[in-house]
Amino acid sequence: MMRFTIGVVCLVAVLLSLAEVSEANYKNAPMNGIMFGKRGPTEYDQRGKTFTALCEIATEACQAWFPSTENK
């Protein structure tokens, strides 16, 4: 019973720490007309680069883990 209680407490602590991290990463958008669709191109550029880098990493990892067997 004691191990179960310690496990639950640890799980709750981990979940709470993850919630705090996600709150810290949240960024309020500046009020420069965003609600009217007036974003500058630089605001999209950083997200695109990040997404592209993540896709490249995932592609390389998948190719290493699951090699393709092509029949010729």
UniProtKB/Swiss-Prot annotation:
It is found in: Secreted. GO terms for cellular component: extracellular region. Expressed in corpora cardiaca (CC), corpora allata (CA), antennal lobe (AL) and gnathal ganglion (GNG) (at protein level). Expression detected in only a few animals (at protein level). The modification Phenylalanine amide is found at residue 36. Its main location: secreted. Residues 1-24 form the signal peptide. Belongs to the FARP (FMRFamide related peptide) family. Residues 40-72 form a propeptide. Keywords: Amidation, Cleavage on pair of basic residues, Neuropeptide, Secreted, Signal. Disulfide bonds: none annotated. It comes from Agrotis ipsilon. This is Neuropeptide IMFamide. One of its GO terms (biological process) is neuropeptide signaling pathway. Coiled coil: none annotated.
